[in-house]
């Protein structure tokens, strides 16, 4: 998994406390790379990754390279919005 750090885009979810508390959804911006955990869509390179700040506890999914760049509380929500 070490090689992912070199080929994966460098994204980071940014937490908006108010939105996070209400809906579990916030926007992201460029940040540090972390390993992908789940939800890779082969065709367009979009994926839902776990482990981005403030998601280090693996309780949210960030859409990377898809239709949206946001944070979701479940993989299903992320996949639906991202792909």
Swiss-Prot record:
Question: What residue intervals traverse the membrane?
Answer: none
| Organism name | Zea mays (Maize)
Report whether Amino-acid biosynthesis shows up as a keyword of the record.
Answer: no
Q: List the disulfide bonds.
A: 60-82
Q: What is this protein called?
A: Protein MATERNALLY EXPRESSED GENE 3
Q: Give the Pfam families listed for this entry.
A: Meg (PF24153)
Give the signal peptide range: 1-22
List, alphabetically, the InterPro entries matched: Meg
Keywords, in A-Z order? Disulfide bond, Signal
Tissue specificity as recorded in UniProt: Expressed in endosperm, anther and pollen.
Q: Which protein family is named in the record?
A: Belongs to the MEG family.
- Keyword Disulfide bond assigned to the entry: answer is yes
